Amino acid sequence: MSDLAIRIDNLSKTYAGSGIAPKRALDDVSFGVPRGEIFGLLGPNGAGKSTLINILAGLVVKSGGRAEIWGFDIDQHPRNAKRSIGIVPQEILFDPFFTPREALELQAGLYGVPKHERITDALLSALHLTDKADAYARTLSGGMKRRLLVAKAMVHSPPILVLDEPTAGVDIELRQQLWDYVRGLNREGVTVVLTTHYLEEAEQLCDRIAIIHHGR
């Protein structure tokens, strides 16, 4: 078994333009994320970080190269690859009339987690959402919604957690709570990947850092 949680080999993505030149968002990118580490993917806005994450999430189809998640090729074993990763997207999107509890239960159901194995209450508690568990999502603050995104990513207890710009627009207190939780997960063996353009944040949290710029 590979000692890499994520392996990227010569990954590329080109977006075809309508009447304009194609845009190459990823250009022959290769790197590996060792299991059990906190790994930072650092780069400015538009560098290609979110494109790479969206390929891992199955939301974007790569143009070339290979990607493995926990040893599973995303093309050959897409279901196993997807079950091995939890992704916290940069955008905060929720059905405004779902409660946090309902959102987590629905997400667990989508992953086929049996009811007796679900960890909904534990996630709500760990992310300081217990008192809002039955409130409509539209009533939550931005910080609470971001914490709920983290909880949704962990409903199936994946060995890898990916956070795409998780502290964008988040106050300092909430940022600290989030990192305390992430460090706790990492101590329990979860591999963590975060994208950020904050060098100081990456240096404080990460075991190692890769820099991506202009898709490379």
Task: Annotate the PLM regions.
Residues 157:
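Conserved catalytic motifs of ABC-family nucleotide-binding domains
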Residues 161-164:
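Catalytic Walker B motif of ABC-type/P-loop ATPase nucleotide-binding domains
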Residues 2-6, 14-28, 35, 78:
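A short, flexible loop at the N-terminus of ABC-type nucleotide-binding domains that lies
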Residues 136-140:
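Conserved ABC ATPase signature
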Residues 105, 109-132:
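Conserved ABC ATPase "signature" region
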Residues 44-48:
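Walker A (P-loop) phosphate-binding loop of ABC-type ATPase nucleotide-binding domains
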